[in-house]
Amino acid sequence: MKQLQAEITAFLKERDWLDQYNHPKDLAISLSLEAAELLECFQWKTDEIALKENREELLKEVADVLIYALQIAESMGADGEELVRMKLAENRRRTWPKKIKKSCFTK
């Protein structure tokens, strides 16, 4: 993932965007906006219909969200992969309420 973060940084440098727009607050706002675009693909549709009609667009929006998440990590001097691994380890140690352990969709 470090290589991916480096590619994103190179892309930003090529366009002279790194110093102008690569600040955690601005990136968090942009990530939220991209996540909203991802949600728009599902608005008023079932998962099945949304995936059938908008799969390509959905995947592009997922990529945008991932790119911004990695940019935030990079702007804070953190490694994205390391952050994900640390959070997964933390989640494994957590105790989850029985309510969420079982899917609300199962009967």
Roles of regions detected by a PLM:
Residues M1-V62, L66-K107:
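Flexible "arm" and connector segments at domain edges
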